[in-house]
C-alpha cells in the first residue's frame, strides 16, 4: 500500500527521536514514540481505488455522511473523517479546476454543523461536462493543515487525488439541481469509489 511522503517523513523523525530516547533513557521510554510513528504510517496510507464509470460523482473522502441538505439553491453533502479514516482527498467529478479559495476560520470539531461555514477551509470549484460542483476541504479540531495539490486551470479525472487534510476533518460537496444525491446520513463512503450522486440530465 502507498504511504503519503509526509507520513514517511513524520515516521522517520519519530524513529530518530525514539532512538535518541532509547540511548539516553532506555528502550522502554522509546516505545510511545515508536507507536506514534506506526500510527503516522497508518494515518497517511493511500490505497488505490476502483473508480466507477458513468455520469456520476464519487466521494471526495473516506468517512461518514453526516448531512444532506439544501444550501443556497444547491444541495450540500457533508462527510466527517475521523482520525482512523484515509485522509487522501479525491475530486468528485472530472473537469477543470476553476477556482481555489482559501478561507480563514475556526477549528471547531468537524462533526459539528457550523464548521461548514465557520472553520478554516479550501473551497474548490470544478467544472466539466456541462456541470459545476463545489467541494470544501474543512479543517477540524485536530486537523489544522489542509493540503491541495492542484491549481486553477488543471484538469482532473474522476476520483483523482487532489490533496489531504491532516488528522480528522470534514468535506462538503455542493451539487446543482442537475444532480441527484444517492447517499444518506449515516452511510460510510470511500474516496474515489463510492458513488454519492448521479446526473439527472445524462443517461448512464
Swiss-Prot record:
Annotated Pfam families: PS_Dcarbxylase
Cofactor(s) the record lists: pyruvate
UniProt membrane topology term: Peripheral membrane protein
Pathways per UniProt: Phospholipid metabolism; phosphatidylethanolamine biosynthesis; phosphatidylethanolamine from CDP-diacylglycerol: step 2/2
GO cellular component, one term: plasma membrane
PTM per Swiss-Prot/TrEMBL: Is synthesized initially as an inactive proenzyme. Formation of the active enzyme involves a self-maturation process in which the active site pyruvoyl group is generated from an internal serine residue via an autocatalytic post-translational modification. Two non-identical subunits are generated from the proenzyme in this reaction, and the pyruvate is formed at the N-terminus of the alpha chain, which is derived from the carboxyl end of the proenzyme.
Active-site residues (renumbered): 169
Annotated site, Cleavage (non-hydrolytic), chain positions: 168-169
PANTHER family from the UniProt entry: ARCHAETIDYLSERINE DECARBOXYLASE PROENZYME-RELATED
Protein name stated in the entry: Phosphatidylserine decarboxylase proenzyme
Organism of derivation: Solibacter usitatus (strain Ellin6076)
Lineage, opening ranks: Bacteria, Pseudomonadati, Acidobacteriota, Terriglobia, Bryobacterales
Amino acid at each position: 500500500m502507498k504511504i503519503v511522503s509526509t507520513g514517511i517523513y513524520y515516521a522517520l523523525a519519530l524513529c530518530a527521536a525514539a532512538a535518541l530516547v532509547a540511548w539516553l533513557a532506555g528502550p522502554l521510554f522509546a516505545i510511545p514514540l515508536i507507536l506514534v510513528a506506526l500510527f503516522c504510517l497508518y494515518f497517511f496510507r493511500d490505497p488505490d481505488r476502483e473508480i466507477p464509470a458513468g455520469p456520476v460523482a464519487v466521494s471526495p473522502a473516506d468517512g461518514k455522511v453526516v448531512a444532506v441538505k439544501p444550501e443556497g439553491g444547491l444541495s450540500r453533502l457533508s462527510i466527517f473523517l475521523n482520525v482512523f479514516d484515509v485522509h487522501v482527498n479525491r475530486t468528485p467529478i472530472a473537469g477543470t479546476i476553476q477556482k481555489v479559495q482559501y478561507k480563514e476560520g475556526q477549528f471547531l470539531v468537524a462533526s459539528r454543523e457550523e464548521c461548514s461555514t465557520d472553520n478554516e477551509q479550501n473551497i474548490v470549484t470544478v467544472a466539466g461536462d456541462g456541470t459545476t460542483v463545489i467541494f470544501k476541504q474543512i479543517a477540524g479540531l485536530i486537523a489544522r493543515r489542509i493540503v491541495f495539490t492542484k491549481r486553477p486551470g488543471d484538469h482532473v479525472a474522476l476520483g483523482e487525488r487532489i490533496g489531504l487534510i491532516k488528522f480528522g476533518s470534514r468535506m462538503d460537496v455542493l451539487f446543482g439541481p442537475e444532480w441527484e444525491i444517492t447517499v444518506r446520513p449515516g452511510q460510510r463512503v470511500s474516496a474515489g469509489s463510492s458513488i454519492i450522486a448521479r446526473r439527472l440530465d445524462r443517461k448512464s
